[in-house]
C-alpha cells in the first residue's frame, strides 16, 4: 500500500495571517481579493483557473457533484452556464439549494459557498451565448447533455449536421441552454495553517440581507 501522506510536510504552506480582514463587510469583497491573488499566483500554469465544484441534490436527496466554470461573480452571486436538461439542470429545477467549492490548494486556500440557484433571464443568457465561439454554439445544439450516447461517431455526426444547418447564419441560443446564478447565503473562507491550525471564517446572510462573520474551529 502506498502512503500518500508520508513525507508531504513540505506541501503545507505557512499560515499568512491575512485570511479575512475585519473591515470586509461583504464576502464578495473577500472573494474578489482572493480570486485576484489566485490568478496572480497561478499565472499561465493552471488550466481553467475559474473551475469550481458544483454540488446538487435530487428529490430523493441523492447528491451529485461536478466541475463547472465560473463565468462571473459579484454581489448578485456566482454565475455559470449549462444545459437545463442535464442532470445538474434537472436537479436544480427540483431542488435549487446548491453548494460550490473553489479548491485553490496551490495557494493553500479554499472557498465554500451555499446558496440558491436561479435561472438567469433570457437577455443575460443571450449575452453569454453571443460571447461563445461558433463551434461552442453548435455544440450546445447537438449535445443532449447527460443522456446516454451510443457512440462518439453519432455525436460528431450530429455536430456536423448542426454546423451545416446554421451555415452562413447567426446561431441562436437554444432554449435548453443558458445561465444560472447562485445567490449565496453562506460563504466560508479557509486558509491553510501550520500544525493543522487552519483559519476558517464563515459569512452568513441574515433575513435583512446583511452579512455577519464568525470564526470556526479548524
Curated annotation (Swiss-Prot):
The record's remark on the cofactor is: Binds 1 FMN per subunit.
Single GO biological process annotation from the record: pyridoxine biosynthetic process
Q: Which pathway does UniProt place it in?
A: Cofactor metabolism; pyridoxal 5'-phosphate salvage; pyridoxal 5'-phosphate from pyridoxamine 5'-phosphate: step 1/1; Cofactor metabolism; pyridoxal 5'-phosphate salvage; pyridoxal 5'-phosphate from pyridoxine 5'-phosphate: step 1/1
What EC number(s) would the UniProt record show? 1.4.3.5
Known InterPro entries for this protein? Answer: Pyridox_Oxase, Pyridox_Oxase_CS, Pyridox_Oxase_N, Pyridoxamine_oxidase_dimer_C, Split_barrel_FMN-bd
| GO MF terms held by the record | FMN binding; pyridoxamine phosphate oxidase activity
Could you say which protein family the record assigns here?
A: Belongs to the pyridoxamine 5'-phosphate oxidase family.
The record describes the protein's role as: Catalyzes the oxidation of either pyridoxine 5'-phosphate (PNP) or pyridoxamine 5'-phosphate (PMP) into pyridoxal 5'-phosphate (PLP).
Please state what the protein is called. Pyridoxine/pyridoxamine 5'-phosphate oxidase
Species of provenance: Anaplasma marginale (strain St. Maries)
Amino acid at each position: 500500500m502506498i502512503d500518500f501522506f508520508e513525507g508531504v510536510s513540505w506541501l503545507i504552506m505557512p499560515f499568512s495571517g491575512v485570511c479575512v480582514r475585519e473591515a470586509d463587510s461583504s464576502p464578495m469583497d473577500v472573494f474578489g481579493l482572493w480570486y485576484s491573488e489566485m490568478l496572480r499566483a497561478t499565472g499561465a500554469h493552471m488550466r481553467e483557473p475559474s473551475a469550481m465544484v458544483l454540488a446538487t441534490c435530487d428529490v430523493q436527496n441523492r447528491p451529485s457533484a461536478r466541475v463547472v466554470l465560473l463565468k462571473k461573480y459579484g454581489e448578485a452571486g456566482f454565475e455559470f452556464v449549462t444545459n437545463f436538461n442535464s442532470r445538474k439542470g434537472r436537479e436544480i429545477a427540483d431542488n435549487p439549494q446548491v453548494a460550490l467549492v473553489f479548491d485553490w490548494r496551490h495557494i493553500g486556500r479554499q472557498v465554500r459557498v451555499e446558496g440558491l440557484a436561479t435561472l438567469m433571464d433570457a437577455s443575460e443568457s443571450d449575452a453569454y451565448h453571443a460571447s461563445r465561439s461558433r463551434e461552442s454554439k453548435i455544440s450546445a445544439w447537438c449535445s443532449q447533455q447527460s443522456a446516454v450516447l451510443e457512440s462518439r461517431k453519432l455525436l460528431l455526426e450530429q455536430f456536423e449536421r448542426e454546423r451545416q444547418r446554421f451555415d452562413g447564419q447567426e446561431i441562436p441560443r437554444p432554449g435548453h441552454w443558458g445561465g444560472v446564478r447562485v445567490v449565496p447565503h453562506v460563504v466560508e473562507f479557509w486558509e491553510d495553517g501550520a500544525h493543522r491550525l487552519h483559519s476558517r471564517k464563515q459569512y452568513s446572510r441574515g433575513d435583512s440581507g446583511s452579512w455577519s462573520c464568525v470564526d470556526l474551529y479548524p
